[in-house]
Amino acid sequence: MTHPSDTGPAPVLALEDISKSFGAVRALRDVSLELFPGEVHALAGENGAGKSTLIKTLAGVHRPDAGQVLLDGRPTVFHGPADARDAGIAVIYQEPTLFPDLSIAENIYMGRRPRRSFGRIDHKATRAATAALMRRLGVELDPERPARGLSIADQQIVEIAKALSFDARVLIMDEPTAALTGSEVARLFGVVRTLREQGAAVLFISHRLEEIFQICQRVTTLRDGALISSEPLDGMTEDDLVRRMVGRDLDELYPKQEVRAGEVAMSVRRLTREGVFTDVSFDVRRGEIVGLAGLVGAGRTEVARAVFGIDRWDAGEVEVEGRRLTNGAPSTAMAAGLALVPEDRRAQGLVMNMSIERNIGLTGLRTTVRAGLVDRGAERSRSLDWAAKLQVKYARIADAVSTLSGGNQQKVVLAKWLATGPRVLIVDEPTRGIDVGTKAEVHRLLSALAADGVAVLMISSDLPEILGMADRVLVMHEGRVTAEIPRSEATEESVMAAATGRAAA
């Protein structure tokens, strides 16, 4: 492996022919990687490709079975994360772990705050050092501000500042934008560019291909634990990268089947929850995919939760197949044929320490319970059937769902609800945090469900997904529906205009 410039700097950190196995599973096979100062390097691959194992090897969590880690060209062994940190390597995860009741400065210098005479903490010096870090990153954050209440984006910036306080030269950013808005992503990318200009090496992991092309100069692609390529992004297209990641050409990423919409399956009228959303009305017809777009905080998820009965509403009504739903009663919604795949699959859609088969079987207990006992045979048969239909990849159906990749966890949530035979399916951010191959599978599934007559309400912050999959687009802004746009007229510009309150319904 060589740097694109023969006269360029030597790699600050490199992996050379790294292999790592867990039992009989080979997570990495002879993988090499070079990270250069002043460069943002993407790590691409589907879930299960080996990205997490590679990151943990760089961070000192895992020791390789074969191969070596090179720091400034010299072989080195990390006996733990502390060794990697002392070597100038830091990992920024998508969910920061700050102490909420401590200030930004206290979080950054936890256990390392400057001392004055007699061992007293020098608060002034701590604040000054924190302010200097923020200036270096080109951001304005008050060092004395508590971490509680910071946005995810600001928390990540604090984590980056903390890494720099340890003189980090290599920053590994693992899905840093997954929970960020467009403006927050832009701000974070500004910080990343500043780091690059200051000579840091950044390893950037994201399922959002457009971000890789926007911020990175090179990309290393893994597939099934093996190195596929490591090359400049100049001249490469998203389709090229997808082929390297999945080993094949994807049939359309948005395989929307044209279906004639049928009768109204779900009707929402003047739904209001004080201080959250107001006077929300819309219909979803059989065979139709309706996209619900809007910025973070617009009220989309809150409407879905109220419609399903998780949260109560103050005014309005919801009907499914002509049957009025009881306010605040999910059991009534389920009995009417409504299913909800929630936004946070780990916290709301799955019981992580429970098996795959039990998770899929949770919604079918009414049919698998006999004389007060669960018929395990019936539950297993049902779970195996749905896992096969959705092509869930697992070792054993009895394994904990926590052992699955994010994409396969999402398939389990979908299987759990599709097993109920829903007439109306609400999916909230159905492809967030999953790889491009699984994303295409989910899109094909939603399209097939609509073709079979299921009414689908799809909430998504991914505009290309909304435009590619929806027959109609509803847009919310500050708790109100501000536009309803047919597929033929929906563009990024028209949706964003309504999402920012610049268009009227």
Swiss-Prot record:
The record's GO molecular-function terms, alphabetically, read: ABC-type D-ribose transporter activity; ATP binding; ATP hydrolysis activity
- Keyword terms: ATP-binding, Cell membrane, Membrane, Nucleotide-binding, Repeat, Sugar transport, Translocase, Transport
- Report the catalytic activity: D-ribose(out) + ATP + H2O = D-ribose(in) + ADP + phosphate + H(+)
Q: Which InterPro entries match?
A: AAA+_ATPase (IPR003593), ABC_carbohydrate_import_ATPase (IPR050107), ABC_transporter-like_ATP-bd (IPR003439), ABC_transporter-like_CS (IPR017871), P-loop_NTPase (IPR027417)
Q: Return the SMART domains for the record.
A: AAA
Q: Does the keyword Transit peptide apply?
A: no
What are the binding positions for ATP in this chain? 45-52
EC number(s) from the headed UniProt entry? 7.5.2.7
- Describe its membrane topology: Peripheral membrane protein
Q: What is its main location?
A: membrane
SUPFAM superfamilies tied to this protein? P-loop containing nucleoside triphosphate hydrolases
A cellular component term from Gene Ontology for this protein is: plasma membrane
The similarity comment for this entry is: Belongs to the ABC transporter superfamily. Ribose importer (TC 3.A.1.2.1) family.
In Swiss-Prot or TrEMBL terms, this protein is called Ribose import ATP-binding protein RbsA 2
